[in-house]
Amino acid sequence: MDGFSEYDPEKGIPLAIDPNLISIPVSTSLTTNGNGDEGVNNEDATVFAADDADNAKSQKSLIQNPYEYFGQMPLEQFIPLMLQQRGTGTKFADIHEETLLEEISRENSSKSNNAIQEEDNDDSAIQNVDEKTTTVVNEGVSDSHEMKDEDGDVNMDVPSVESSPKLAEEREPTADANDAQRAISGNQEESITLEEFKMIKKNVLEHVNMALNESSLSLEFVSLLLSSTRTSAGISSMSPYLKKIAPPASLNADKVPLDILDEHEKLTYDIIHKGWNLRSLEDCKRLLKQHYQILSKSVESEYHYWKQISDNITNKDVLFKMKDKNTGRRTLGIKYGFDDSGSCYSADKGIALLRATSEGSQLELVPIIDSGINVGISRGSSEQFVRVRIFTKIEQEDDYLLSGQSSLNELLLSSRSDIKSQIAKLRFFIFEKELMHQLKKEAGQLLPYGVSVENENKVLLELSNEKIEFELINLDEEVTSNYQQEAAKVNDKRANLILVMLNMLLVVMYKKQLWKRLNPNPHSSKSSKGYGKDLVLLRAILGKIRHKKYTQLIEKIVNNAILEKKEDSIMTTNTDITSNDNEPSKNKELATLQREIALFDKILSMPRTDFTINIPEKGKLELSLRSTNHCNAIIHMKYIDVGQVVKFDTRFSEFTEFEEFLNFVYNEFLI
């Protein structure tokens, strides 16, 4: 298409926009009356205008635009319409691009064949019309010769070829045939390929969209400008988006007169302009410098922060992300508790924040005591440790004298404030708190054996001639100074050993709990029976002390009842009686835990001592001092004569009964 095609009433006007956007007046008759009467012409024009006004909707459209009907149609409407036109049984999934291309090619070929056939028909019709026209003209000429008057002049009353109705009817098909021939030739000249049509369509759509966008922007600008003077008119044409972001009457236009400046004023304005630019540059320079300093300080602080973490945190420490409730920032948390090692202590979660100090030069640990409460590493109630003191009874008096006290841990006397020291202190404090918690829990089961809980931080163990006190005290300057000033006592070493033993037994308790967690079938192993019993802390120490007292008492009874009376008799003692029936686990980790727990079997096992009394010519007497709960005493007694015959085998739980029966045996069998 060259853009200069003439107007064709059959084809319409070649436009590239939607015809609904414009209003085209209906074309009037292009022919005039042959008589040239102006009154008749005016009357005909009036009649045509009235008919056009009444039948505007029934007139044939000047423009053929199928895009008007299908271009703006949504897919949910277009797809059913297309399937309906293609016939029943057609599925949209069966329509492919290749199928559509084949249909388009077949349609184009059929159209070209039809056009050729119509052209042949038009040629034959034109030839027939020419022959008819020639015949009619010849007849008219012959008639004109025949209609001459007597003088030989032609009669003017005879109608001419142009004014003859017959000739006019014959000429109209000739004009229609010529128009059809021109239309066919025009269609052949204006035919384009599918690719060219798509390209033209794409360009037209781009230009239309651009024109619509520009017109919309222009309308928005004019509406906003109009709203300052005519609010209702401006708001009615404004889009909802513009109403939301730009209030009405926010744009105005004024006519400002342009004053012509002289050279001096131009120079002044130029200097002011450069001054403002210079001031803006100075402000930018100052802001950039400030932000650079802030960023440099932040980078330096971050560098020191991560360097200290790298220097003080090892691969054994557990780090994780958490939120600092004081600052609201995401930071690192460290787990200093012993939950992963087998601890069941839940009063303190053992979690602390790694927070940089205000100066940013050092890190500090902020432990989280419970949910929502953050407590710093300042000396306070959270710093507590267990102290062991031994009180010895004064002879012939009811008063007790302090004879021993556990020493203060060197970690508490250190003044170092680095992260390693802080982590070590936090672990020490939480370990001491859990130790006191377990001591109080176990003391409730040992009340019949002289163990009592005086308050929430003190457990007292009473023996025959001494008292052992376990107390959780706060770490303050007074306690520290008292430890440094007090002189050494007799039982200080014993108090330290008791405290160390309690710490080691608590570690063994951790290992037992960890063994239970790692063992998939804890009831299938023989060692699970021993690991599943009550936890042993005070019970083990108290049992050893009481067992030693019981052993001394039995030796005294045997010495008075037999050894002093039978000088040749000999008593031997065996205390190293431990049995290890635990089968080694095939799991490497479980086997390691079993070996570590087995190191404490001697103190964790029930105390037992065997006595063998050999009496010449009378046989032997076997005694076994045992316990069922670490604290009580059960005596097994068996007498075997010279002939290896067991005379009796009995058991006692009271020492008075044992002493009486031993005297009876001596009088009946050993004299």
Curated annotation (Swiss-Prot):
GO molecular function terms listed in the Swiss-Prot or TrEMBL record: transcription coregulator activity
A cellular component annotation (GO) from this entry: core mediator complex
Signal peptide positions (record): none
Cellular location(s): Nucleus
Database matches in InterPro entries: Mediator_Med17
Keyword Nucleus attached: yes
One of the GO BP terms on file: regulation of transcription by RNA polymerase II
Domain of life: Eukaryota
Keyword Transcription regulation among UniProt keywords: yes
Keywords per UniProt: Activator, Nucleus, Transcription, Transcription regulation
Region called Disordered, residue ranges: 104-188
Protein family according to the UniProt entry: Belongs to the Mediator complex subunit 17 family.
Record's subunit section: Component of the Mediator complex.
Function: Component of the Mediator complex, a coactivator involved in the regulated transcription of nearly all RNA polymerase II-dependent genes. Mediator functions as a bridge to convey information from gene-specific regulatory proteins to the basal RNA polymerase II transcription machinery. Mediator is recruited to promoters by direct interactions with regulatory proteins and serves as a scaffold for the assembly of a functional preinitiation complex with RNA polymerase II and the general transcription factors.
Protein name: Mediator of RNA polymerase II transcription subunit 17
Species assigned in the record: Kluyveromyces lactis (strain ATCC 8585 / CBS 2359 / DSM 70799 / NBRC 1267 / NRRL Y-1140 / WM37)
Gene: SRB4
